[in-house]
């Protein structure tokens, strides 16, 4: 230090140098450290937040004092955004860090509980809640009724007209057929068994079908007036039993039984006897008015017959000219084939008094039944895409067993009390009147007629 001063100012007397100044220049601080400069904290005034709030309040008062502006102008002109003052300190930015962290944890736990699978009735049935009120009609009541129903064919039409014949018919199918054939020694046991059998073979209802009428009247009117077709004197019937167990016994014991000189065909509706083509023959070239009893007597010498079926028209109930005969034994078919191209005596072609043929006997065409391919299935208005396997099974079974009327309404939704009606769901069953053309001939004539009537009234 002294050498530098000596070079500038020359030799200086040490006595003249002040000691305090000499100590100040002799001690040096050295170079400045950059880290020490950056680590210095800034002082923030405590009233900065209050100033910001006061500025925002003043700005709101100014906006409220301004006159109202229309909606269109407010949409076009956007108000200038107020810039928020930046927080001066990092600690101020992270004041709510801990509170936000715990809130995030609580939200994650709540979402995890919501995502857990809950076992409910809707998951088990895989059906939405909205479809609980809707019910598809699968005709379960009609299917259960078909299990207790027996079909009886080739019945004499006097069952409808005569009360005596009707009582005999009801007694035949209302009692146990096995008890009549078996003989028992004790009369008391017979009476007790008959009472129990009568309960088992109790009839719920009897309905007659395939009735041919002489005049083209409504069926109810023609039935009340008993205007039946003279050449079609046989009908069919359906008997509904109260117990399901009676159907099998009735079908196995009363099939091919003679009632009023007619062989009855008895079969179950739900479980009909299978059509065995090996034991059956096809009979063609029949008269349209031919009856089943003529075929029974013609083919009875060939062997025991299981049933005779003449194919008839659904509207007129008259024959179509061919039939099927099924035997109980396979060997009977070979004997029946020998009757090919041989005439058959018909009861309809004989005079009642002289019993002589009124028409020439027809030569029958007898052949074996062929293996025909199945035709197209009977269509229904049922959408099967939204059904389960069990529902499809029930729908397919109902389609085979039920009649035309029940098949048409199969699979439709049942209206439940309390549901709102929607447009297009129900049918009014009324024909909508077509609007008349504005330029048609009818409108022109009506306008001219109205004008003529108006002129007459003025005169």
UniProtKB/Swiss-Prot annotation:
Compositional bias of kind Basic and acidic residues: 47-69, 342-355
Pfam family, one: RRM_1
Chain intervals for the UniProt region annotation (Disordered): 38-96, 340-394, 423-459
Main location: nucleus
One GO molecular-function entry: rRNA binding
Skewed-composition ranges (Basic residues): 356-373, 429-448
Residues with PTM Phosphoserine: 70, 184
Keywords linked to the UniProt accession: Nucleus, Phosphoprotein, Ribosome biogenesis, RNA-binding, rRNA processing
Entry's localization field: Nucleus, Nucleolus
GO CC terms, sorted: nucleolus; preribosome
Top-level taxon of origin: Eukaryota
Domain RRM, chain residue ranges per copy: 279-371
In-chain residues carrying the UniProt-annotated modification Phosphothreonine: 181
Biological process (GO), any one: maturation of LSU-rRNA from tricistronic rRNA transcript (SSU-rRNA, 5.8S rRNA, LSU-rRNA)
Functional description taken from the UniProt entry: Involved in pre-25S rRNA processing.
Remaining remarks: Present with 5910 molecules/cell in log phase SD medium.
Family membership noted in the UniProt record: Belongs to the RRM RBM34 family.
Name the record gives this protein: Nucleolar protein 12
